[in-house]
C-alpha cells in the first residue's frame, strides 16, 4: 500500500511538474513573441521616421535653393508620415508664403500648437497680417506679449503699426518701452523717425547717432539723419550723410534722390541731375526720382522733357499727387491750360492743398 501511495505521489508530482514546465514554456514563448513583435514595431517606426526625415531633408534642400513649389510636396510627405513633425510644418509655411498667405498662416499656427515654446511662428503670422490687415497684426503682437511680456520685438512692431497710422506720439512711447528692455539700432532709428515727424529734431539726431554707434552698416539710418539736417537747413551735413548712406549701399535709390533734392534746393541743377541718373540706374521704377527729374528739367526750362518725366512718375504711381501738381505747372508753361487744370484737379483730389491755389487763379 505504501509503495502504491509513493508511486501515485510520484506520478502526480511528475504530472504537475510537466504541466508547470509546459506553462513556463508557454510563458517564455509568449514573452519571446511579444519581444519580437516589439522589435518589429520599433523597426517599422524607425523606417517610417527615416522616410519622414528623408522627405524633410529633401524639402530643406529645395527650400534652400528657392525651389518653393517643389519643396512643398516633400514637407507634405514628411507630415503625412509624422503628423507631429512641427519642423516640417514650419518649413512648409515658409514655402507657402511665396504663393498663399492663408496656407502659410495655417501652418505657422499648427507649428505653434505643436511647440508652444517657440514664438517665431506667431511673429511670422503677425508679419503676414501686417501686409493686409494691421488690426489682426496688432492682435497677434498683443497675443505674443500676453504669453511673454518682455518680448521687445513685439513692442517695437506695435510701434511700427502706430507709426504707419501716423500716431507718432504713441509710436514713440512704444519704441521707448522696447528700448528699456533691449537697446538696438533698429528701434533707436524708429524712435528717431518719430521725433523727426514730431519736429523734435535734436532728439531725432541723438537717436540716429546712437543707432549708428551700435551698427554703422545700416544705410537707411545715415539717410534718415541726412534728412533731419536737410530739414534744419544744414545742407553740408545733409550731403555728407547722404554720401555715407550711399557708401553703405551703392544701389540706394532713395539716398541718391534725396541728395538730388538738396542740390536742387541750392540750384545746382547739373549736379542734381547726376544724382537722379544714379537713382534711376539703381531702380528704374523709382517714381520719386522721375518726379525730381521733371522738376530739374522744369527749372532748366525744358518743359516737354519735364512733362515726360512726370508722365513716367505717374505711370509708375497713379496716385502720385506731387507729380500731378508739377506736371500741371509744366503744362501751363507750354499753354496747355486744359491739361494743367486737369492735373491740378487730380492733385487736389489726392490731398495737395496748393493745387487749390492754381485752380482758383487759372482754372475758374
What name fits each language-model region?
Residues 81, 114, 147, 180-181, ...:
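Structural marker of alpha-solenoid helical repeat scaffolds
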Residues 24-48, 329-364:
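Terminal, low-structured helical/coil segments at or just beyond the last alpha-helical repeat
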Residues 56, 60, 87-94, 120-127, ...:
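Conserved alpha-helical positions within TPR/SEL1-like repeat arrays
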Residues 51, 85, 118, 151, ...:
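Residue-level recognition of tetratricopeptide repeat
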Residues 65, 98-99, 131-132, 165, ...:
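Structural motif corresponding to the intra-repeat A-B loop/turn of tetratricopeptide repeats
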Amino acid at each position: 500500500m505504501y509503495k502504491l501511495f509513493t508511486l501515485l505521489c510520484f506520478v502526480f508530482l511528475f504530472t504537475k511538474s510537466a504541466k508547470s514546465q509546459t506553462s513556463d514554456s508557454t510563458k517564455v514563448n509568449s514573452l519571446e513573441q511579444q519581444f519580437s513583435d516589439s522589435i518589429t514595431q520599433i523597426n517599422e517606426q524607425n523606417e517610417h521616421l527615416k522616410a519622414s526625415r528623408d522627405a524633410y531633408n529633401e524639402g530643406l534642400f529645395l527650400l534652400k535653393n528657392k525651389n518653393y513649389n517643389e519643396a512643398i510636396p516633400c514637407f507634405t510627405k514628411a507630415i503625412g508620415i509624422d503628423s507631429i513633425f512641427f519642423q516640417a510644418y514650419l518649413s512648409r509655411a515658409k514655402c507657402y508664403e511665396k504663393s498663399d498667405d492663408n496656407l502659410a498662416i495655417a501652418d505657422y499656427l499648427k507649428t505653434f500648437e505643436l511647440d508652444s515654446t517657440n514664438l517665431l511662428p506667431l511673429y511670422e503670422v503677425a508679419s503676414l497680417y501686417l501686409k493686409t490687415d494691421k488690426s489682426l497684426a496688432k492682435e497677434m503682437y498683443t497675443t505674443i506679449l500676453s504669453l511673454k511680456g518682455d518680448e521687445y520685438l513685439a513692442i517695437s512692431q506695435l510701434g511700427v503699426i502706430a507709426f504707419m497710422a501716423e500716431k507718432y506720439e504713441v509710436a514713440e512711447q512704444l519704441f521707448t518701452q522696447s528700448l528699456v528692455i533691449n537697446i538696438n539700432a533698429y528701434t533707436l532709428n524708429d524712435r528717431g523717425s518719430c521725433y523727426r515727424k514730431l519736429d523734435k529734431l535734436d532728439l531725432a539726431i541723438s537717436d540716429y547717432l546712437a543707432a549708428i554707434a551700435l551698427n554703422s552698416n545700416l544705410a537707411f539710418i545715415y539717410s534718415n539723419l541726412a534728412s533731419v539736417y536737410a530739414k534744419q537747413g544744414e545742407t553740408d551735413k545733409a550731403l555728407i550723410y547722404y554720401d555715407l548712406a550711399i557708401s553703405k549701399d551703392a544701389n540706394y535709390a532713395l539716398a541718391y534722390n534725396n541728395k538730388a533734392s538738396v542740390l536742387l534746393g541750392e540750384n545746382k541743377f547739373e549736379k542734381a541731375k547726376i544724382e537722379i541718373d544714379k537713382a534711376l540706374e539703381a531702380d528704374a521704377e523709382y517714381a520719386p526720382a522721375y518726379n525730381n527729374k521733371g522738376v530739374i528739367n522744369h527749372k532748366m526750362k525744358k518743359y516737354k522733357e519735364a512733362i515726360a518725366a512726370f508722365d513716367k512718375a505717374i505711370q509708375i504711381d497713379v496716385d502720385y499727387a506731387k507729380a500731378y501738381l508739377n506736371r500741371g505747372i509744366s503744362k501751363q508753361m507750354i499753354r496747355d491750360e486744359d491739361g494743367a487744370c486737369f492735373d491740378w484737379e487730380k492733385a487736389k483730389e489726392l490731398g495737395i492743398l496748393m493745387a487749390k491755389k492754381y485752380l482758383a487763379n487759372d482754372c475758374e
